[in-house]
From Swiss-Prot:
The active site is at 129 (for autocatalytic cleavage activity), 167 (for autocatalytic cleavage activity). The gene is lexA. It catalyses: Hydrolysis of Ala-|-Gly bond in repressor LexA. Homodimer. It is an enzyme of class 3 (hydrolase). One of its GO terms (molecular function) is DNA binding. This is LexA repressor. Keywords: Autocatalytic cleavage, DNA damage, DNA repair, DNA replication, DNA-binding, Hydrolase, Repressor, SOS response, Transcription, Transcription regulation. Represses a number of genes involved in the response to DNA damage (SOS response), including recA and lexA. In the presence of single-stranded DNA, RecA interacts with LexA causing an autocatalytic cleavage which disrupts the DNA-binding part of LexA, leading to derepression of the SOS regulon and eventually DNA repair. The record marks 93-94 as: Cleavage. The keyword tRNA processing does not apply. GO terms for biological process: DNA repair; DNA replication; negative regulation of DNA-templated transcription; proteolysis; SOS response. Its EC number is 3.4.21.88.
Length: 208
């Protein structure tokens, strides 16, 4: 097989692996790859998989027969744009400010959150009220859209003044408490609160 034909077959295999994972949630077996791309020899497929791995397009786990993961470089080779999270403005972690709902940019979706794709957004945090939870001024929080939360979860909530804030959520007897993670700051006590989502991730781009 010529170099050009070999490269074409490898891309065909890579595409089949990607499509299979997207459709059913786990990779194909080597025999399934053989049938899909018209190869009769499993050793030939193993050779193509090894070359795809050397090129940085695929990650294999030799101890698990179906452990095939396409890398970001592999997806780029297939012309697949990475999934992205919309960045929808700024939320304060000190005193609440008016929420900004316009999408300002997009952020690559972390692989471990792909199952929540379409339900996530990102907000930049200003203020120090959540520092004991590890959320610092300038951090970006990844938020899964949901309208309810359990006590103790960190949420993005709208106050009754139509302002947004990041706090730890508590529902108490006759009110809601949005609790900062900073001993110098008081909680926000509300009769009504609207939860925009739960904080499920954090991105910091200024690590020293």
């Amino acid at each position: 097989m010529s170099r050009k034909n070999s490269d074409t077959k490898q891309l065909e295999i890579l595409r089949y692996i990607y499509d299979t994972v997207e459709n059913r949630g786990f990779p194909p077996t080597v025999r399934e790859i053989c049938a899909a791309v018209g190869l009769s020899s499993t050793s030939t497929v193993h050779g193509h998989l090894s070359r795809l791995e050397r090129k940085g397009f695929l990650i294999k786990d030799a101890t698990k027969p179906r452990a095939l993961e396409i890398t970001a470089e592999g997806k780029t080779e297939l012309g697949i744009k990475p999934k992205e999270i919309p960045v929808v403005g700024v939320v304060t972690a000190g005193q609440p400010i008016l929420a900004v709902e316009d999408i300002s940019e997009y952020f690559p979706l972390p692989p471990d959150l792909e199952s929540d794709a379409g339900e996530l957004f990102m907000l930049k945090v200003h203020g120090n009220s959540m520092i004991k939870a590890g959320i610092l001024n300038g951090d970006n929080v990844i938020v899964r859209k949901q309208s309810t939360a359990n006590n103790g979860e960190i949420v993005v909530a709208m106050t009754d003044e139509n302002e947004a804030t990041v706090k730890r959520f508590f529902k108490e007897d006759d009110h809601y408490r949005l609790q900062p993670e900073n001993d110098t700051m008081a909680p926000i006590i509300l009769q009504q609160v609207s939860i925009l989502g739960k904080v499920v991730g954090l991105y910091r781009n200024n690590i020293q």
